[in-house]
Amino acid sequence: MIRIAIDAMGGDFGAEPIISGVIEALKEAEFKAVLVGDSNAIKPLIPQPYLKNIEFIEATEVISMSDGATDALKRKDSTIYKAVELLKEKEVDAVVSAGHSGATMSLATLRVGRLKNVSRPAIATLMPNSKETATLVLDVGANVDCRSEHLFQFAIMGEAYAKEILGRKEPKVGLLSNGEEESKGNEVSKEAFKLVSRLDSFVGNAEGNQIFDGSIDVMVCDGFMGNILLKTSEGVADAIGKIIKKQVKKSPLAMAGSVLMRKVFKTLKKQVSYDEYGGAPLLGVNGCVIISHGKSNSKAIKNAIFQAIKFANSNINKVIEEELSHFAR
């Protein structure tokens, strides 16, 4: 049975939405949940019938968002440190955390280690597109500064994830740039273009709008650009939702129409909500680490757990190592 360590205290809203997400996941999937945190605070939130599929690991500290990522290495009694340590010792198959993403990434990289030939792990996230297939974008925050070879490795890892986890037989990989021409981009991206061109899946430079029109499956960029892209798209989606609500309230006719379009709005909200994707895998580490949004609700945690189960049951890390070995110097 798959064993998943879950940082039970790391989210912005405490343990309640995390535990609710675990319970929802246990209703639909068979796995062992290893909850890391204060059991005295966690146990009262769990209905008796689910306790048989839950284990508790005591941890008294929580890494807050105001703490530095490197502080986590010294806080050995923190929830995320203990969760990652369980993965390192192979006592669990995956880790899910909605806590400090920088701390999670640092601990996973330094304690669990990187896959062979991986220089830097990358955070990969799914973003909605008009074809309803979702586009994988990486890196979205793990590496602010990248060299061309790092972007090349991200492309290989993203392609492998698209094939093994998303089921895309022939994924199209693009390099995020300010134009499709080979001459576009900065010096790093131009050099990366030459390297990524060795992949049959590479379709060339791609502009930001192609993430959302579904014309590519994997978009590669550095973590600085990727994180801005992610946060901007979240902000735009939120703003559009608020604008629609305001405009609907201004007109009785619009309000009547919104009732008729309720199903459409519900489908749209579902498609653009991060709750549906659950979390972002940290690709390139020697294990399965899913980083969830700090504001994750129970549905997001449930889907992050499902994502971890699928990852843990796959050969994704083996595939990444094999693909990278073909290009190792």
Swiss-Prot record:
This enzyme's EC code(s):
2.3.1.274
- Any one of the GO CC terms: cytoplasm
A single Gene Ontology MF term assigned here is: phosphate:acyl-[acyl carrier protein] acyltransferase activity
Q: Which UniProt keywords apply?
A: Cytoplasm, Lipid biosynthesis, Lipid metabolism, Phospholipid biosynthesis, Phospholipid metabolism, Transferase
Q: Where is this chain's protein located in or outside the cell?
A: Cytoplasm
GO annotation terms (biological process): fatty acid biosynthetic process; phospholipid biosynthetic process
Chief subcellular site? cytoplasm
Catalytic activity, as annotated: a fatty acyl-[ACP] + phosphate = an acyl phosphate + holo-[ACP]
What's the top EC group for this one? transferase
Q: In which pathway does it act?
A: Lipid metabolism; phospholipid metabolism
User: Which domain of life, per UniProt?
Assistant: Bacteria
Is Nucleotide-binding among this UniProt entry's keywords? no
Function summary: Catalyzes the reversible formation of acyl-phosphate (acyl-PO(4)) from acyl-[acyl-carrier-protein] (acyl-ACP). This enzyme utilizes acyl-ACP as fatty acyl donor, but not acyl-CoA.
Give the UniProt family note: Belongs to the PlsX family.
Q: Which PANTHER family does the record match to this protein?
A: FATTY ACID/PHOSPHOLIPID SYNTHESIS PROTEIN PLSX, PHOSPHATE ACYLTRANSFERASE
Subunit (UniProt): Homodimer. Probably interacts with PlsY.
- The protein's name: Phosphate acyltransferase
